[in-house]
Regions:
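Active-site-proximal loop/turn and secondary-structure-junction residues that shape catalytic pockets
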Residues: 35-37, 69-71, 101-104, 142-144, ...
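Bacterial N-terminal signal peptides
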Residues: 8-16
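N-terminal pre-domain/capping segments
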Residues: 6, 20-134, 282, 286-300
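Active-site acidic/histidine proton-transfer and metal-coordination neighborhood
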Residues: 87, 94, 105-203, 278
Length: 300
């Protein structure tokens, strides 16, 4: 653990020096903290490494983060919301979004009654409101939903969660992987969800990598369902912009059509030649900061 802390501190110093000398254009840019799970994924690692990691991210140019460590009882990364907000404030960051999972069980689906799930969400929303979070996002769906009737129940569930979020000044969203672009009973799973959720209460956090991996065009979805994608995941599996497979220029050039207000970088793994997740984060940040098609801000 001591070696990890020393290594992080050394890397953070390098990023701090580079940011002072290069002074890239400031852009509103988020990062999913799941990307750094090897450094801060557990509560213990977060407590040990948070100061150095959060400062390093801010020095790279990130302005906000998305969480992925809610315990279901009001704590994020093992901390009370007030403490986590203080940690982020000290680094010059804010938390705009969080990924939390609370699936329905077989009884909920059979009865189409999910009222027993809503107190959990009320606790979740209250905790994240203390952090100033804008978006609460369900990161995935069960992979074994057999019928559109089950998907419809989830859509109604999401509408209900979205109403709770809206009452507290937040937005509820759903994050896709590739499986949502498959068909159930002849209907594309993802399309059905968009068409059967209320745009007042539910947005869709398009993960552009997973969409591309499924063989669909994010931009075509922006055109088909304008305004439904308020926050998107900017991902290239490894460092953003390095594979040449994902058309980030077209994605960002159509951000207004999509309804994008915020975007969040996510890195699934580090390239072998890079070898360090913080360096992967820096390469991704530099790509977006220097890209002429990425605006300084998408918020109104």
């Amino acid at each position: 653990m001591k070696k990890i802390i020393i290594a992080i501190a050394s890397i953070a110093f390098v990023f701090s020096f580079a940011s002072c000398s290069q002074k890239p254009a400031k852009k509103e840019m988020g990062i999913q903290l799941y990307s750094l799970r090897t450094l801060i994924g557990s509560d213990e690692d977060f407590a040990a490494n948070k100061t150095e990691v959060l400062k390093a991210l801010a020095d790279m140019g990130y302005t906000c983060v998305e969480a992925a460590n809610y315990d279901g009882e009001g704590h994020i990364y093992g901390e009370e919301p007030e403490q986590l907000k203080a940690d982020l404030d000290a680094a010059g960051l804010k938390m705009i979004s969080t990924h939390v999972n609370h699936w329905l069980d077989d009884e909920n689906l059979a009865s189409k009654d999910f009222s027993n799930r809503m107190d959990w969400w009320k606790t979740c929303i209250a905790a994240h409101k203390k952090l100033g979070v804008k978006y609460i996002v369900m990161p995935s769906m069960p992979g074994d939903l057999p019928t559109l009737a089950d998907v419809k129940t989830y859509c109604e569930y999401y509408n209900a969660i979205g109403k709770l979020c809206a009452d507290q000044g937040m937005k509820f969203g759903f994050h896709n992987h590739s499986g949502e672009f498959e068909k159930i009973e002849g209907k594309v799973f993802y399309d059905y969800m968009i068409e059967n959720t209320d745009p007042r209460y539910v947005f869709f956090q398009m993960d552009v990598y997973w969409a591309d991996n499924a063989g669909v065009s994010p931009v075509e979805y922006f055109k088909r369902y304008p305004g439904r994608f308020e926050c998107i995941h900017v991902k290239d599996w490894r460092e953003v912009g390095q594979s040449g497979k994902v058309g980030f220029d077209a994605i960002f050039n159509n951000a207004a059509l999509a309804g994008v207000k915020d975007y969040v970088v996510e890195i699934e793994e580090t390239s072998p030649e890079v070898g360090d997740i913080l360096e992967s984060c820096r390469i991704s940040a530099d790509y977006l900061l220097s890209a002429p098609f990425v605006k300084e801000s998408y918020s109104e």
